[in-house]
């Protein structure tokens, strides 16, 4: 039995959110959403990630998932209840069900088998699709601490290659950006060490 199958056998929640933004960060989801389960890296087909989610109340722009049959994005399986705390965090999105056949576990050895497919069918998978797509602007910029939170989660769970996937599988990087590391403005920012920030800067510079 591979790691993924073992992980699925341990889950008691039947709902699994496909976290592709700040939920990628273990630190952020634990501190702000009380989600303490370990995430599993996955690639989701049928959705494009882009800088299109405008938060009117937070005056920022976040990544969002848009239905696109020709695109894919990297994410993490996050078992959790769809509770008020999570709904508040994701209030600029709608929860959309995803077919298990659209999930690719590229970081785990072993191809999909009938037994694995059977295990996956026991869960309902959800992705947060953007309700209203608006690109970042000077009034609603992207904040560096949000980018850091997303990419630190990728580095933690999948290393440099997973962080590179986040950059490559996200559209509209040409946007107004605020470097708020000295005074974080993103309200669910992860606690990130300076060496991780430096790695993120290098990855962004090379993209």
Protein language model features and the residues they cover:
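A glycine-rich, hydrophobic/aromatic-adjacent loop/helix-cap motif
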Residues: 1-207
């Amino acid at each position: 039995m591979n790691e993924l199958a073992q992980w699925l056998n341990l889950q008691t929640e039947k709902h699994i959110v496909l976290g592709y933004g700040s939920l990628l960060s273990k630190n952020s989801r634990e501190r702000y959403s009380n989600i303490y389960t370990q995430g599993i890296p996955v690639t989701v087909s049928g959705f494009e990630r882009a800088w299109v989610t405008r938060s009117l109340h937070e005056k920022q722009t976040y990544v969002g998932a848009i239905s696109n049959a020709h695109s894919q994005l990297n994410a993490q399986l996050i078992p959790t209840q769809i509770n008020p705390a999570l709904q508040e965090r994701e209030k600029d999105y709608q929860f959309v069900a995803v077919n298990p056949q659209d999930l690719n576990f590229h970081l785990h050895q072993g191809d999909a088998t009938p037994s694995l497919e059977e295990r996956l069918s026991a869960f309902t998978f959800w992705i947060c699709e953007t309700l209203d797509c608006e690109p970042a602007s000077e009034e609603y910029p992207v904040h560096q601490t949000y980018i850091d939170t997303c990419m630190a989660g990728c580095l933690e769970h999948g290393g440099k290659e997973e962080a590179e996937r986040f950059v490559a599988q996200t559209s509209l990087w040409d946007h107004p950006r605020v470097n708020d590391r000295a005074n974080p403005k993103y309200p669910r920012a992860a606690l990130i060490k300076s060496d991780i920030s430096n790695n993120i800067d290098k990855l962004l510079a090379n993209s």
